[in-house]
């Protein structure tokens, strides 16, 4: 059935329909960012002409907007157009991951693996399985945002459910719940370092450890898995109707060749993991930090994405040879070319997106907006629960316009960490508030390079889907996740539970 007009007689259905209609009137993402660049250029020219600035509450220095339409702006822009595009960090990582994951899909490894997994899962609980796997996949950082959504769709296909529902459930897990982790991951390392630096302004002895949010974030995985599963089953899938894809899109029973291939792939996977473990677990492992011999940070953590790509290549090659989907050397590049063709639209969209992000950063607009809004919130005199909500809403708003969560926290932490400490709260508690807000709205952020990617995934199953279709379908997850997560944190605070080992919301 068509998803461009999703049936519902309820008020919520009318809301989603309105969001879809409005969203579908938004120009193609390529044109959208062209228009945003024009608006940004005019805005910087006006603010610069009138000498508008914002006062940085941290050191009192003015934050001035730089004019993109000035001679200085032109001199910066022309030599950096190609650099802005080729140096756009997510582009290389996404394309490289698609090479690996695309090969795994083309040789038949991922579909076979999904059928194998689905054979042990009741279709009724598929939503919860997809979400839980998505949360666990955060150990691979941004790679999870590329790998998990297509896998979620395949899992739902395997159990006879709508693939778009599986796709959206996976996006919710890797996107809305990006910072909810069972394990300590790179996000913990990055944010805790920023928080420690910010706390030093108030108390030089204060240290925010990588495990200071662990109890709360690990518990969040359980809560959000349940919440996300209910959203998928009760809200999303009923709106999609019955999946009416072609018969060849449905995953079939595994053949003997596929079973043999999975066994070979499993053995190779274990050997690969064992080899990496031997380079990481020993104190003198070659993938540990060469000076401090730590795992976090280390070449292993910094190189996690290349290692995942290599893992895909090695295991896919083993499966392909075992099942004879790879018969000769020439098959390998051919199989990798096909998934890259599907990324052409994404690459085109990234060009203006990369220019917009670079221009936004160079002009100081991001810092100007952040500092201005932060100053308003700080001067409002909020404390306690209103301060919690204020920081969360401010963070959510900024995350819609600044793609890097660490960049936003670098701006907010120097103001809010000392402010929360003055109110008697641990800096790790302020950090949790930011993490909740940052994660929840990730699938909605128009400047995120992953939104066009998610739209491309959706168009595999709904070719005529537009940005409005995507937003109307994914919208319940960010809204409900944000509310439930904040309520969970409020309950955690009121009960007085530790948010990490020996760390409580309030300073002792």
Curated annotation (Swiss-Prot):
Leftover remarks: It is suggested that in wild-type strain abgT would normally be cryptic or not expressed under conditions of growth on minimal medium. Altering the expression of abgT from its wild-type context appears to be the mechanism for obtaining the growth phenotype.
User: Which source organism?
Assistant: Escherichia coli (strain K12)
Task: List the molecular function annotations (GO) for this entry.
Answer: secondary active p-aminobenzoyl-glutamate transmembrane transporter activity; secondary active transmembrane transporter activity; symporter activity
Give induction info. Answer: Could be transcriptionally regulated by AbgR.
Location(s), subcellular:
Cell inner membrane
InterPro entries documented for this protein: AbgT, AbgT_Proteobac
The UniProt disruption phenotype note reads: Cells lacking this gene loss the p-aminobenzoyl-glutamate utilization phenotype.
The record's GO CC annotations read: plasma membrane
Its main subcellular localisation, reduced to a broad class, is membrane
Keywords assigned by UniProt, alphabetized: Amino-acid transport, Cell inner membrane, Cell membrane, Membrane, Symport, Transmembrane, Transmembrane helix, Transport
Activity modulation notes: Completely inhibited by 100 nM sodium azide and by the proton ionophore carbonyl cyanide m-chlorophenylhydrazone (CCCP). Is also strongly inhibited by 100 mM potassium fluoride.
What residues form the membrane-spanning segments? 30-50, 85-105, 121-139, 140-159, 164-184, 211-231, 261-281, 303-323, 343-363, 382-402, 405-425, 439-459, 479-499
Q: What does this protein do?
A: Essential for aminobenzoyl-glutamate utilization. It catalyzes the concentration-dependent uptake of p-aminobenzoyl-glutamate (PABA-GLU) into the cell and allows accumulation of PABA-GLU to a concentration enabling AbgAB to catalyze cleavage into p-aminobenzoate and glutamate. It also seems to increase the sensitivity to low levels of aminobenzoyl-glutamate. May actually serve physiologically as a transporter for some other molecule, perhaps a dipeptide, and that it transports p-aminobenzoyl-glutamate as a secondary activity. The physiological role of abgABT should be clarified.
* Annotated catalysed reactions: N-(4-aminobenzoyl)-L-glutamate(in) + H(+)(in) = N-(4-aminobenzoyl)-L-glutamate(out) + H(+)(out)
Q: Does the keyword 4Fe-4S apply?
A: no
- In its UniProt entry, what is this protein called? p-aminobenzoyl-glutamate transport protein
GO term, biological process aspect, one: p-aminobenzoyl-glutamate transmembrane transport
Question: Has the keyword DNA-binding been applied to this entry?
Answer: no
For membrane topology, the record states: Multi-pass membrane protein
């Amino acid at each position: 059935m068509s998803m461009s007009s999703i049936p519902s007689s309820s008020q919520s259905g009318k809301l989603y329909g309105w969001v879809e209609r409005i969203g579908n009137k938004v120009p193609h993402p390529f044109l959208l960012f062209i228009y945003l660049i024009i608006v940004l250029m005019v805005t910087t020219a006006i603010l610069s002409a009138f000498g508008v600035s914002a006062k940085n509450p941290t050191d009192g220095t003015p934050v001035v907007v730089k004019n993109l339409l000035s001679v200085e702006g032109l001199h910066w822009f022309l030599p950096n157009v190609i650099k802005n595009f080729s140096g756009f960090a997510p582009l290389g990582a996404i394309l490289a991951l698609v090479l690996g994951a695309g090969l795994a899909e083309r040789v038949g490894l991922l579909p076979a693996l999904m059928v194998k997994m689905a054979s042990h899962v009741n279709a009724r609980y598929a939503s919860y399985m997809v979400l839980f796997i998505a949360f666990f996949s955060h150990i691979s950082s941004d790679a999870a945002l590329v790998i998990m959504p297509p896998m979620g769709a395949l899992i739902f296909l395997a159990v006879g459910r709508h693939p778009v529902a599986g796709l959206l459930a996976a996006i919710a897990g890797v996107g809305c719940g990006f910072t909810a982790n069972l394990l300590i991951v790179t996000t913990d390392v990055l944010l805790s370092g920023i928080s420690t630096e910010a706390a030093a302004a108030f108390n030089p002895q204060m240290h925010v450890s990588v495990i200071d949010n662990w109890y709360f974030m690990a518990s969040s995985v359980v809560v959000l898995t349940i919440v996300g599963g209910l959203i998928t089953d009760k809200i999303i899938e009923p709106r999609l109707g019955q999946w009416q894809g072609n018969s060849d899109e449905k995953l079939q029973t595994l053949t003997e060749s596929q079973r043999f291939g999975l066994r070979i792939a499993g053995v190779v996977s274990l050997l690969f993991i064992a080899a990496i473990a031997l380079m990481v677990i020993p104190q003198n492992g070659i993938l540990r930090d060469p000076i401090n011999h730590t795992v976090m940070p280390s070449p292993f953590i910094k190189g996690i994405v290349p290692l995942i790509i290599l893992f895909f290549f090695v295991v896919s090659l083993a499966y392909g040879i075992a099942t004879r989907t790879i018969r000769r050397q020439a098959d390998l590049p051919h199989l990798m070319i096909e998934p890259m063709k599907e990324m052409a639209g994404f690459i085109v969209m990234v060009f203006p997106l990369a220019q917009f992000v670079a221009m936004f950063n160079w002009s100081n607009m991001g810092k100007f907006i952040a500092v201005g809004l932060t100053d308003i919130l700080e001067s409002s005199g909020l404390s306690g629960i209103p301060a919690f909500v204020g920081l969360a809403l401010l963070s959510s708003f900024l995350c819609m316009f600044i793609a890097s969560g660490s960049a936003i926290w670098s701006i907010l932490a120097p103001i809010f960490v000392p402010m929360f400490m003055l109110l008697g709260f641990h800096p790790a508690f302020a950090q949790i508030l930011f993490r909740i807000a940052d994660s929840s709205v990730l699938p909605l952020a128009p400047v995120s390079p992953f939104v066009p990617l998610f739209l491309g995934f959706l168009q595999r199953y709904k070719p005529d889907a537009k940005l409005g279709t995507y937003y109307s379908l994914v919208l319940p997850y960010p809204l409900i996740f944000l509310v439930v997560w904040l309520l969970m944190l409020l309950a955690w605070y009121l009960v007085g539970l530790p948010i990490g080992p020996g760390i409580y919301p309030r300073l002792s």
